[in-house]
Amino acid sequence: MTSEIMTTEKVAEGDEIFFVGLLPQYYNTRRNEPVTRFGRLALSPKEKIASPEGPIDLLFAECQSFPGNSGSPVFLQFGPIRQAGTIVVGGDRLMLLGIMKGYFYQRGKVNIHPVTTLELAFQENIGIAAITPVQKLHEILFSEGLVQQRESAN
């Protein structure tokens, strides 16, 4: 999905998204089965987001993402038709929005007081996931260096 499609389709905060990823706490003996998580686009920032890697392009989604979900494709779902126990998705109304990058968490400390003060640090997932937009993936895949590398391999 390009910026033009996002504008044409009026993609905005509140639009439904979903992704499929692993749930590390659940695994089977014969095969690992992915879980599907649903949410909504929460913010499409107009500027880059500060990160340890430097400023990056991100989209924010209101959904739970945990370790094991990074790299999962995230889809934008226009107007799902729900039927008992199923979700029917219209063919051209499903678009790749990006790739799951991670999640945001709240840092905090807990003081325990009876006789001794013990300070425990914790990180709590706040329910906002970070998505690398598909436009960024397109830029990387079709960068001059990678195009030349693919051409020289042929």
Language model regions located:
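Catalytic nucleophile loop of clan PA
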Residues: C63-I99, V110
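Gly/Ser-enriched beta-turn/beta-hairpin loop segments
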Residues: T29-V35, E47-I56
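Terminal peptide-recognition signature
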Residues: G14-F19, L41, A61, S70-V74, ...
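A structural micro-motif recognizing beta-strand termini
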Residues: M1-T7, A61-P67
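PDZ/PDZ-like groove recognition
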Residues: K109-N154
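Short, Lys/Arg- and Gly-enriched loop/turn segments at beta-strand edges
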Residues: P24-T36, Q83-G85
